[in-house]
C-alpha cells in the first residue's frame, strides 16, 4: 500500500472514523485512498473553516478526535479560527495538511509556505513526514498526542502520500491518558472547603459530564460551597436531573461583583477567571484580592478522578447534589423578542438535545431559561473566534445522529460560514435545526 493508505488504515484502526475535508491537488492520493481503505467516513466542506468547526463539534460529542484534511498552508490558514476555538476548548483534532512533494519545495511554487509555522500557535504537536515508510508511525503518534483534549497537526507531502510503504499501517495506538492530580492538592482543597462558606468550585477545562456535575454538586452540597461553570463551556450536561450550577458572567464588571465575596476559589479544569478584554480602570483578574485561588485539577489532568478522590476525603459529610427539577415551561405569546424566543425553546427543547450556542446577545436569556428544560448538552464558543456555530452543529449531528441538534446562531455570525446550510441539507442522518 502507499503512504496515504497506510496513514488512513492507522487512523481507522486507532478509532478515528470521520475525516472532514476540503482537499486540493496535493491531497488527491489521500482522497483516492479513502476508496481503498474501509472504515473512514469522508465529509466534504465548502470552506476550511467549516471543516475545522465541524471537527470540533464532532469531537465534543463523540469524545474522540476526527481528522481534517486541508490543502497546504493557505488551506490550514483558512481553518485556523475554529482550530483556535478547539484548542481553547480542550477539544481533540487531528489535522492532516497536504504539502508539495519534498523535492518540489525548493522551487518556491505559489502555494509554498511554512506550514509548521502556521500550525504551531494552534497545535500541541506538529510533525512533517518525510518518508512513506514513516507516515503510518507518525499517524499513530498524532492520535496518541491528540488524546482527549489536544490538537495534532501532521504535514503530508505529496510524494510521501503516493510513495509505497512496505511497512504498511502501524499498530493501533491508545490516546494519551490524562494524569491523576497530586494528592497534596486534594488535601489543600479539603482545607479550602473547610475554611468557611465563602468558597466556590469553578468547573471547566473541557467536557463537563453529568457524572462530573453530580460529583461536584455533592461536594458543594456537603461543604456549603457555590458551584459555578466557566463562562463558555466546551460541553456541559444540564437541564432536569442535572446538578445546579451558576455561570460566570461574561462582562468584567458583572463577574467582579459575582466573585466579590469568594474567599476560596477551587478550579476544576477551569482557568483563573480573567476579563475577556482589557478595559481602562478594570482589573484583568476578576477574583477579589483576598481570594485564594487553588487549582484542584488542570484541563490536562483527570478532573473526574480528582472530584471522586475529593469526595472520598470528605467522608461522612457528603450530601446529595442539588439538581434542577423539570418544570412545564409555558409557551410564549405576543411579541417575538429575545425573551419569548428563549422561552419557546425552553418549552419545546427535546430530551437529550444538543444546543450549540453562537446566538450572541439575542440568545442571552436562553441559558438560564433552559436550566429546567429537558436534559440536554450545551456547547459554547470557547475561543471567542466567531463563525463556529453552524459548522460545530454539523459535526455534533454527525457524531450523535440520534439526537436533535439546535443551533442558536446570530444573523451576522452566520454569514462567516454561510455555506454550511448546504452541508446541513446534503449530509444524511443529521437532525439539525438553526
Model-identified regions with their sequence ranges:
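Phosphate/pyrophosphate-binding active-site segments
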Residues: 2, 133, 153-156, 167-169, ...
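Active-site diphosphate/adenylate-binding microenvironment
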Residues: 4-8, 12-17, 22-25, 30-37, ...
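Single conserved hydrophobic/aromatic residue that forms the stacking wall/gate
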Residues: 416-434
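Acidic, glycine-rich active-site loops and adjacent beta-strand->loop/helix elements
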Residues: 25-27, 48-50, 71-76, 97-103, ...
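N-terminal cofactor/phosphate-binding cores enriched in small/glycine residues
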Residues: 2-84, 88
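Active-site-proximal loop->helix
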Residues: 33-34, 57, 101-121, 239-243
